[in-house]
Amino acid sequence: IYWEVFSRKKDMTKIIAEIGWNHMGNIKLAKKMIREAKKNGADLVKTQIFNTKNLKSGPWDSDGRREIYKKAELNKIKFKQLFNYSKKIKCKFFASAMSVEDAKLIKEINNNIIKIPSMESRNQPLIDYCAKNFKNIIISTGTSTLKEILKSCKNIPKKKLTILHCVSSYPCKFTDTNLPKIDLFKKYFKRV
């Protein structure tokens, strides 16, 4: 598998290293993760931008995760530091946004690419904002039907949009991967 990954054509599959919020707000750790991802062949590195004040209500309110998320927040200064560091080491860097406010912060630093996570894949104000303000939009589809995805993406030019097939159960059993859905997406979307 190692050889297949590193000998692939550059215009084909892209490997995205998901840093997420695993840095827990520690910039030194985040930079190390970016460096290691690049060293190990990632084409892009992705983190998450969110403000716990903007998070919708959910299970994280009752199980203590909201407090953990708070520690992992990246403000504009920290995000810019990571973006500039990534640029310095020639590693493409981008983030997921949970709200329009988060997307605005990302746009101030980098309007080239943004990701919308599965749980926000039906957040029309966020999607419409991104369609107007970003050159490339990646949308995860783990919690949406095809009909919902088509409706959400109707205002995004096809050349800007990449759809990710996602399964929102962790760890995912192979029987739950639903890989044929990728072929279905290819019928409707240019980049899957």
Spans of model-derived segments:
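Catalytic cores and adjacent flexible loops of soluble metabolic enzymes
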Residues: I1-V192
